[in-house]
A protein has these predicted regions:
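Anionic-ligand binding patches
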Residues: 1-129
């Protein structure tokens, strides 16, 4: 899988569904993120595979892996590639009138050390990753 992805872009699709129990209202959203993989060497790939990390990952990689760094020039939702697109979740929760006391996009970017170029657009309702 990682040899196939090497040097190419692919898309990660992450779907969300939140059910409000008191009125059974279901709100769904979909995040599609373009992921440009870098041209890592066979040696880097072998070292990463030997860690065992790719064995339980969709796509066989963790974008946040501290040693491998499989992705370059990311321009989409980093959190989505990790598994939970937080801005999309906020958008769903707002639709359900759930108020949050935390600036989730700022907290996400601070935690991930990633300046997200799409968070504002997502929160405006645009369909981008």
């Amino acid at each position: 899988m990682l040899k196939f992805l090497r040097g190419h872009a692919h898309q990660v699709y992450t779907a969300l569904a939140v059910l409000r129990m008191n009125d059974e209202r279901l709100v769904m959203d979909l995040c599609v993120t373009d992921v440009p993989m870098r041209n890592y060497s066979d040696g880097e790939l072998e070292t990463y595979v030997l860690t065992g990390d790719p064995l339980d990952k969709a796509g066989a990689y963790a974008i946040q892996h501290p040693g491998f760094h499989p992705v370059e020039n990311m321009k989409g939702c980093y959190a989505s590639v990790m598994g939970l697109p937080l801005c999309h979740l906020i958008r769903v929760l707002r639709t359900l009138d759930v108020a949050l006391g935390t600036d989730v996009p700022a907290a996400c970017q601070s935690l991930l050390q990633y300046q997200c170029p799409v968070s504002r657009a997502i929160l405006r309702g645009e369909q981008i990753g």
